[in-house]
Amino acid sequence: MSIKPLGDRVVIKRLEAEETTKSGIIVTGTAKERPQEAEVVAVGPGAIVDGKRTEMEVKIGDKVLYSKYAGTEVKFEGEEYTILRQDDILAIVE
C-alpha cells in the first residue's frame, strides 16, 4: 500500500534538522524549529485548470524547501509525512 496524492498535492518526508547549534549547544525536541527541507516521495497528477491538467514541477526524489507551516502531517505505516499543495513548495534544492 502507498500514498497517492490527488490533484496538485505532493507527499514529502522531512529531512532532519541539525540537532546542535554552531556554538555546540544541543537543541532538544521541543526547542527545535520545524524543518523546511524535505524529499518528495509522491506527486499527484496535477490540478485541472480550464479543463486541462497542469504539469507538476516537482518529481519523486527532489529535495525541496517549503513554507514553514504548510500542509497536513500524516502518519502512514509508522512513518511521518506531510501532504501539501505544490504552491507551498518554495524551491527545489539542486
UniProtKB/Swiss-Prot annotation:
SUPFAM superfamilies: GroES-like (SSF50129). Keywords: Chaperone, Cytoplasm. InterPro entries: Chaperonin_GroES, Chaperonin_GroES_sf, Chaprnonin_Cpn10_CS, GroES-like_sf. GO terms for molecular function: ATP binding; metal ion binding; protein folding chaperone; protein-folding chaperone binding; unfolded protein binding. One of its GO terms (cellular component) is cytoplasm. Its main location: cytoplasm. It is found in: Cytoplasm. GO terms for biological process: chaperone cofactor-dependent protein refolding. It comes from the Bacteria. SMART domains: Cpn10. PROSITE patterns: CHAPERONINS_CPN10. Gene3D superfamilies: GroES chaperonin. The keyword Cytoplasm applies. Together with the chaperonin GroEL, plays an essential role in assisting protein folding. The GroEL-GroES system forms a nano-cage that allows encapsulation of the non-native substrate proteins and provides a physical environment optimized to promote and accelerate protein folding. GroES binds to the apical surface of the GroEL ring, thereby capping the opening of the GroEL channel. Belongs to the GroES chaperonin family. Heptamer of 7 subunits arranged in a ring. Interacts with the chaperonin GroEL. HAMAP family: CH10. This is Co-chaperonin GroES. It comes from Clostridium perfringens (strain 13 / Type A).
